[in-house]
Amino acid sequence: MYEWHWHIEWQTPYEFHGHAITKVIAEEKTPYQRALLVELARFGKALILDGKIQSTITDEFIYHEALVHPLLLSINNPEKILILGGGEGATLREVLKHKTIKNVTMVDIDPVVIDFAKKYLQEWHQGAFDNPKSKLVIEDGYKFIKETKEKFDAVVIDLTDPIKDSPSQMLYTKEFYEEVKRISKWGIVTQATSPSFSLETFSIIYNTIKHVFKKVSAGITYVPAFDGLWGFVYASDEVNPAEFSKEEINNRIKERIDGSLRFYDGETHITMFSIPKHIREVLEKENKISTRENPVAVPA
């Protein structure tokens, strides 16, 4: 008999991915979500929120490098960045690798997740919370965006999936992206769920952002712990990361990144934006828009 328990993550109402849990490190029900920190048999230490794996020690670098670097390397000398979500601190870690960064504000709604990260996820944040360039704000992201008078060079949106009636759901709407655009000089990037398990959700997020920004591109990559492709949407009125060549990206990494990258380089950049035809066709044909009245949601 196997001496472990199982974490069952539902991808759709009729499909799940099972992970063997060898150890429960910490667990807490917060006012916003159920937070669980575990050791998985295959992927090691992992953060799970509301039944969804957020990242694991084995492959978190794939997701976080893909989220951050295509946008920040495409803009000129980013200095002031806003992160929404990103409780593990790994998104903050990647932003701080850019030599031109002067300050980063990270806004997360749940202090329990931040405490989890500071105490247990040192491999993720690598001291980023204590960097003098970092500022942590515990607040609802939508509220912060509407009330702030600050302007940022770019906004990195690293939220949980738009689960129905969750705190994150309204942060995938046209109204929200319009508010984010108001405070962003160069543009935004958001995680956009999985084209493998929720292609309609991915395409609606993409189409919604297309109705707010002039230049919008979708990127994808495979994340093993998620058991499928993961999608990102990059948006700006000024630049399009998808238009940069392999050589341009490699040169910018050499000039502008302080520290090593394990996943992302010029060749990976080209691969991320080389989206299969069937997914491109869905993106091109999508006509639904996520609004506060009718917000998009993942199927499970």
Swiss-Prot record:
Alphabetically ordered keywords of this record: Cytoplasm, Polyamine biosynthesis, Spermidine biosynthesis, Transferase
UniProt keyword S-adenosyl-L-methionine present = no
**Stated family:** Belongs to the spermidine/spermine synthase family.
Broad enzyme group: transferase
Species, as recorded: Sulfurisphaera tokodaii (strain DSM 16993 / JCM 10545 / NBRC 100140 / 7)
Q: Which domain of life is it from?
A: Archaea
UniProt binding sites for spermidine: H64, E88
Provide the protein name.
Polyamine aminopropyltransferase
Q: Report the SS bond pairs.
A: none
From its record, what is one biological process in GO terms? spermidine biosynthetic process
Q: Give the catalytic activity.
A: S-adenosyl 3-(methylsulfanyl)propylamine + putrescine = S-methyl-5'-thioadenosine + spermidine + H(+)
Positions binding S-methyl-5'-thioadenosine in this chain are Q33, D108, D140, G141, P167
Q: What PROSITE patterns does the database record attribute to this sequence?
A: PABS_1, PABS_2
As one GO molecular function, the record gives:
thermospermine synthase activity
The record's subcellular location field reads: Cytoplasm
Q: Which residues form the active site?
A: D158 (proton acceptor)
Q: Does the keyword Transferase apply?
A: yes
Upper classification of the source organism reads: Archaea, Thermoproteota, Thermoprotei, Sulfolobales, Sulfolobaceae
| Oligomer status and interactors | Homodimer or homotetramer.
Cross-referenced HAMAP family? Spermidine_synth
Q: In which pathway does it act?
A: Amine and polyamine biosynthesis; spermidine biosynthesis; spermidine from putrescine: step 1/1
